[in-house]
Amino acid sequence: MKITSTIPAVLLGLAPLSAAVSVSGSAEGFASGVTGGGDAEAQIPSDIDELKEWLTDDTPRVIVLDKEYDFTESEGTTSGTVCASWGTGSGCQKIIQDDCGDSPSSQATWYTAGTTGIDVASDKTILGDGDKGVIKGKGLRFRDGVSNIIVQNIEISDLNPEYVWGGDALYFDGSDLIWIDHVTTARTGRQHYTFGYETNTRITLSNNFINGETTYSTGCDGYTYWTFEMVGEADQITLQNNYIYMTAGRSPALSGGTLLHAVNNVWEKNNGHALEGGDAGARGIFEGNAWIGVSTIVGDYAGRLFNAPDSSSAGDCESALGRACEVNAVSDSGDLTAYTDTSFFSDFSGLTIAPATSATDAQSSVPNNAGMGKL
């Protein structure tokens, strides 16, 4: 009797292993409708080799990360010349580069794994279990036409943070229908998010914690400069409910032909500038956001921009979003210059638009709910 009564208990104990972790909610904004690995059985990779194999194969998968997967030393080290382009202090980043010009140069060694991300194949869901799912020392790449991918509730961190070109956390270059949600990125060698020149369509970045606090930075002060690089030819990106903390620039760098809807994000502690961008083809609507302790909200920017500066202009969003915009909020920051260009609003036609709450609501909720472990 003891044996037969124990078997069901064991089975009941094992059953939730794969079933307990599942996608929370659904994508809003441009990536609406993404399914990732769909109803594939959830599986936990045993080590970094199995994780990499599952991420890159052609099989639709739901991959659950229940521990730290440390790639740091997995590919050995590389040595070469680095340049002290921003100073020689202990907190200054150096750049991996052969020609240093007038900057001091030295030899250095870094971990090879961090410099190139794992190429994630189509139809994948990557989920963290609670606050345990960490990929350390290597990022993820979405390129060459991959589509239908969900990444939720994980951390990607520690990609040679001392060296520019040490590694991107998340890299997109020719991808479609991708949802990155409740992901924490920290201590990257270069960008937290890089969008390359090939077009990336139907992308939603939501509820993520971009932790810019770092030991090494271009300002030698612990604030990362390398945040979002958006240079795609015709990218479509929803930036929703993200907490962007301790940055100094590229927050984002909105360039190329990118179409951006930035809604209900919170920037806090930026000692440089948030928005920048050098291309006239870039377009962005910023609504319901909060900037707290941001020295300069808009730096050098060449594109078209609407930032809902007041309630009288918010109604202009109706033609782009199907509703009025939420007004942005600023505290302990530089001035929010009014940008009210509506000439690109028709470009939102046919896209799914993320909902918005007030900037006040975002300011109180986003910092406490963004990132891994906050589902």
Curated annotation (Swiss-Prot):
<comment type="similarity">
    <text>Belongs to the polysaccharide lyase 1 family.</text>
</comment>
<dbReference type="InterPro" id="IPR012334">
    <property type="entry name" value="Pectin_lyas_fold"/>
</dbReference>
<dbReference type="GO" id="GO:0045490">
    <property type="term" value="P:pectin catabolic process"/>
</dbReference>
<dbReference type="InterPro" id="IPR045032">
    <property type="entry name" value="PEL"/>
</dbReference>
<feature type="disulfide bond">
    <location>
        <begin position="92"/>
        <end position="220"/>
    </location>
</feature>
<dbReference type="GO" id="GO:0005576">
    <property type="term" value="C:extracellular region"/>
</dbReference>
<keyword id="KW-0456">Lyase</keyword>
<dbReference type="GO" id="GO:0071555">
    <property type="term" value="P:cell wall organization"/>
</dbReference>
<feature type="disulfide bond">
    <location>
        <begin position="83"/>
        <end position="100"/>
    </location>
</feature>
<dbReference type="InterPro" id="IPR011050">
    <property type="entry name" value="Pectin_lyase_fold/virulence"/>
</dbReference>
<feature type="disulfide bond">
    <location>
        <begin position="317"/>
        <end position="325"/>
    </location>
</feature>
<keyword id="KW-0732">Signal</keyword>
<keyword id="KW-1015">Disulfide bond</keyword>
<dbReference type="GO" id="GO:0047490">
    <property type="term" value="F:pectin lyase activity"/>
</dbReference>
<comment type="function">
    <text>Pectinolytic enzymes consist of four classes of enzymes: pectin lyase, polygalacturonase, pectin methylesterase and rhamnogalacturonase. Among pectinolytic enzymes, pectin lyase is the most important in depolymerization of pectin, since it cleaves internal glycosidic bonds of highly methylated pectins.</text>
</comment>
<dbReference type="GO" id="GO:0030570">
    <property type="term" value="F:pectate lyase activity"/>
</dbReference>
<dbReference type="Pfam" id="PF00544">
    <property type="entry name" value="Pectate_lyase_4"/>
</dbReference>
<protein>
    <recommendedName>
        <fullName>Probable pectin lyase C</fullName>
        <ecNumber>4.2.2.10</ecNumber>
    </recommendedName>
</protein>
<feature type="active site">
    <location>
        <position position="250"/>
    </location>
</feature>
<keyword id="KW-0624">Polysaccharide degradation</keyword>
<feature type="signal peptide">
    <location>
        <begin position="1"/>
        <end position="20"/>
    </location>
</feature>
<keyword id="KW-0961">Cell wall biogenesis/degradation</keyword>
<dbReference type="InterPro" id="IPR002022">
    <property type="entry name" value="Pec_lyase"/>
</dbReference>
<keyword id="KW-0964">Secreted</keyword>
<keyword id="KW-0119">Carbohydrate metabolism</keyword>
